[in-house]
Swiss-Prot record:
Transmembrane segments: none annotated. Catalyzes the transfer of the enolpyruvyl moiety of phosphoenolpyruvate (PEP) to the 5-hydroxyl of shikimate-3-phosphate (S3P) to produce enolpyruvyl shikimate-3-phosphate and inorganic phosphate. It catalyses: 3-phosphoshikimate + phosphoenolpyruvate = 5-O-(1-carboxyvinyl)-3-phosphoshikimate + phosphate. Keywords: Amino-acid biosynthesis, Aromatic amino acid biosynthesis, Cytoplasm, Transferase. This is 3-phosphoshikimate 1-carboxyvinyltransferase. NCBIfam families: aroA. It is found in: Cytoplasm. The active site is at residue 312. One of its GO terms (biological process) is chorismate biosynthetic process. Pathway: Metabolic intermediate biosynthesis; chorismate biosynthesis; chorismate from D-erythrose 4-phosphate and phosphoenolpyruvate: step 6/7. SUPFAM superfamilies: EPT/RTPC-like. The keyword Cytoplasm applies. One of its GO terms (cellular component) is cytoplasm.
């Protein structure tokens, strides 16, 4: 796809529903007794994989674009799937689902695409095995395809080596089916969508700063869920609005969960002109409107406990840093290496092609600003949706047009991304 520089970005857009919350609304609705309705669901490829997997386990789910109705009959009504549970490109689907499957009294086989086959699963299968789960796969359960044979589980106290909502959620979902109490402790608090939504479905949890406990045997009751716009998707337009001259963008109903708003902190620290208008009628998940305007930006240092709050936004933050005065340092972000691609490598390689001065480090990168990005190059998403969108925004500010390969990866989380970008830049 060929993209060229834009003069200005103006207008208002509704960011598609949050991917993390959309996945969980389907999963928990499938485990609950009663009818769960979901509004503003993200109909991206990843979340559709979650629907498909639960349909294979006998759950009746109706989906029409961003409206979903799940007719749940409780966790005990899940049936043994007759075919492979295919998660596509979705790490969230496979890791959370492993926690559910671990305690079900049936056999299941789980796999995904080439990218999933490279992603580490032992970080989830290991604690589940400690609870009594029977999980096998390539390299002793490190890689897909994985097989799960139902087992009776016992609660554990698990200290996770990394702050990962996927690990935490998988262990809590297994804990829901285990004998006794299960506790997960993390080095920093990771995103808490699972805890918020389990509470909305009637499950009691006890939480402190970095740990959460769940008692086994609790049942979920159907709930109505509104999914706010995904702040990880909004981040691309927040960056674009700050960088492109004479711009003003209004982003409606964006999720403002404090475990996800690291990008807002970074923009404010860089000196961006950002206005936040919280909504009064937020339910379990806070949301509001964000208004961004062209800003003069300064470099920042990013590391420590903010990293889990913006791990998915680092590609677009790196681009933003090319337009900030000074050297931006991103550290403590080794987790980037096990995303859809090794995002330290892909961010550095693609931005260098556009003329950026950027260096990889062992756990992040250094970006030197302020720079003019020349462009005039062919770049690739490497099959990673967030790299593809970063390059889409980069094309707005490069001197010469760029050719972006493999843009179809963007459908995973933001199918209307280029449509929205064209609307803001007044391109048809």
């Amino acid at each position: 796809m060929k993209r060229d520089k834009v003069q200005t970005l103006h207008g208002e857009i509704h960011i598609p529903g949050d991917k993390s919350i959309s996945h969980r609304s389907v999963m928990f609705g499938a485990l609950a007794a009663g009818t769960t309705t979901v509004k503003n669901f993200l109909p991206g490829a990843d979340c559709l994989s979650t629907i498909d997997c639960f349909r294979k386990m006998g759950v009746h789910i109706e989906q029409s674009s961003s409206d979903v109705v799940i007719h749940g009959k409780g966790i005990d009504a899940l049936k043994e799937p007759e075919s492979l549970l295919d998660v596509g490109n979705s790490g969230t689907t496979i890791r959370l689902m492993l926690g559910i499957l671990a305690g079900r009294p049936f056999y299941s086989a789980v796999a995904g695409d080439e990218s999933i086959a490279k992603r580490p699963m032992k970080r989830v299968t290991e604690p589940l095995k400690k609870m009594g789960a029977k999980i096998d796969g390539r390299a002793g359960g490190e890689f897909t395809p994985l097989s799960v044979s139902g087992a009776s589980l016992k609660g554990i106290d698990y200290v996770s080596p990394v702050a990962s909502a996927q690990i935490k959620s998988a262990v809590l979902l297994a804990g829901l089916q285990a004998e006794g109490t299960t506790t997960v402790t993390e080095p920093h608090k990771s995103r808490d969508h699972t805890e918020r939504m389990l509470s909305a479905f009637g499950v009691k949890l006890s939480e402190d700063q970095t740990s959460v406990s769940i008692a086994g045997g609790q049942k979920l009751t159907a709930a109505d869920i509104f999914v706010p716009g995904d702040i990880s998707s909004a981040a691309f337009f927040l960056a674009a609005g700050a960088m492109v001259p004479n711009s003003r963008i209004v982003l409606k109903n964006v999720g403002l969960n404090p475990t996800r708003t690291g990008i807002i902190d970074v923009l404010q620290n860089m000196g961006a002109k950002l206005e936040i208008k919280p909504s009064a009628d937020s339910g379990a998940e806070p949301y509001g409107d964000l208004i961004i305007e062209t800003s003069s930006l300064k470099a920042v240092e990013i590391g420590g406990d903010i990293i889990p709050r913006l791990i998915d936004e680092i590609p677009i933050i790196a681009l933003l840093a090319t337009q900030a005065e000074g050297t931006t340092v991103i550290k403590d972000a080794a987790e980037l290496k096990v995303k859809e691609t090794n995002r330290i490598d892909t961010v550095v390689s693609e931005l260098r092609k556009l003329g950026a001065e950027i260096e990889p480090t062992a756990d992040g990168m250094k970006v030197y600003g302020k720079q003019t990005l020349k462009g005039g190059a062919a770049v690739s998403s490497h099959g990673d949706h967030r790299i593809g969108m970063m390059l889409g925004i980069a094309s707005c500010i490069t001197e010469e047009p760029i050719e972006i390969e493999h843009t179809d990866a963007i459908h995973v989380s933001y199918p209307t991304f280029f449509e929205h970008l064209n609307k803001l830049s007044k391109k048809s």
